Regions:
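N-terminal Rossmann NAD(P)H-binding glycine-rich loop of SDR-like oxidoreductase domains
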Residues: 1-21
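Adenosine-cofactor binding site in Rossmann-like domains, unifying the SAM/SAH pocket
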Residues: 20-44
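NAD(P)H-binding glycine-rich loop region in Rossmannoid oxidoreductase-like domains
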Residues: 39-76
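Active-site "gating" loop of Rossmann-like NAD(P)-dependent oxidoreductase/epimerase domains
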Residues: 60-63, 68, 101-121
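NAD(P)-cofactor binding segment of oxidoreductase domains
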Residues: 68-96
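NAD(P)-dependent short-chain dehydrogenase/reductase
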Residues: 133-180, 186-194
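Mid/C-terminal beta-alpha module of Rossmann-like enzyme folds, strongest
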Residues: 191, 198-250
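Amphipathic terminal alpha-helices
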Residues: 275-296
Length: 296
């Protein structure tokens, strides 16, 4: 059996859907059964049965709230990955861990490489960075995959927010000076399963540190415009996008201005390239509109 944490999140739900289609034995416990903030809960759940691999998609992702809740963020994002990695090392099984662009400052003018120095701006990024360090401190066979700007038909995310606001407003102000690559959770899940499957079947496959986002780059405003375009084409709600600067939208945690991740290593080592982000957005918006139509 393969243990999946974070099964109710965007990537977790996408992984479960794909694993079911591929008959992969993924087990996703509820938070009551496995609390990543509680080392005793983690130890007790791990002891329930033998595991063939662990996929850690669980995280404390409330970026702004983390500034006031550092202890909880660090327990889930740093403590838990270290504990899971130690278990994987002791039992000689692979670990697949999801990380984030927030480990970087965003000051670099070009896309970030896996080898670039980390310099997180806030508590969330710091806690995720510590999680990576904790995993690498063990000798476990781990693949750490950093991603950014995750969206999907599931949970809370930027595309769903834009679609909701478009029903309520004629225009929406969106930040236009933060750059990144939107990543569809279903697309990312497909890539993660390729890595997981190979690590399961090839004990010599070492893992490593990788970046994975959909191909291409844009700004939050650019992403919002694409969402509105696709929605309007399909008869859904649409609003005019008004570009603003980061300073006009203050948040508790500072955001990286540059969240672009260079994904060349993923292609070189695994033969994986995620499709262009506009195609992903078309599928995501279409799925959301179909869901709304089914509910109305």
């Amino acid at each position: 059996m393969i243990l999946l944490t974070g099964g109710t999140g965007q990537v977790g739900r996408s992984l479960l859907a794909l694993a079911q289609a591929q008959s992969l034995p993924l087990v996703a416990p509820t938070r009551d059964a496995l609390d990543l903030a509680d080392p005793r809960s983690i130890a007790a759940y791990l002891a329930r049965q033998p595991w063939s691999a662990i996929v850690n998609a669980g995280a404390y992702t409330a970026v702004d709230q983390a500034e006031q809740d550092q202890q909880q963020a660090e327990a889930i994002n740093a403590g838990a990955p270290g504990q899971l990695a130690a278990y994987c090392q002791d039992h000689a099984i692979p670990l697949l861990h999801l990380s984030t662009d927030y480990v970087f400052s965003g000051d670099k003018p070009s896309p970030y490489l896996e080898t670039d120095a980390t310099a997180p701006l806030g508590v969330y990024g710091q806690s995720k960075c510590k999680g990576e360090t904790a995993i690498l401190a063990t000798a476990c066979r781990a693949a750490i995959v950093r991603t950014a700007w995750v969206v999907s038909p599931y949970g809370k995310n930027f595309i769903k927010t834009m679609m909701r606001l478009a029903q309520q407003r004629e225009e929406i102000q969106v930040v236009a000076d933060q750059h990144g690559s939107p990543t569809g959770a279903p697309d990312l899940a497909q890539a993660l399963l390729v890595i997981l499957t190979r690590m399961l079947h090839d004990p010599q496959c070492p893992g490593g540190l990788y970046h994975a986002t959909n191909h291409g780059e844009t700004t939050w405003a650019g992403l919002a415009r694409k969402v509105m375009q696709v929605s309007a084409q399909r008869g859904g709600p649409s609003a005019r996008i008004v570009e603003i600067g980061t300073e006009a939208y203050p948040t508790a945690a500072k955001r990286p201005k540059n969240s672009r991740l260079n994904c060349d290593r993923l292609q070189q080592d695994w033969g994986i390239t995620l499709r262009p982000w506009p195609l992903m957005v078309e599928d995501c918006v279409t799925a959301l509109l179909n869901e709304q139509g089914a509910q109305s």
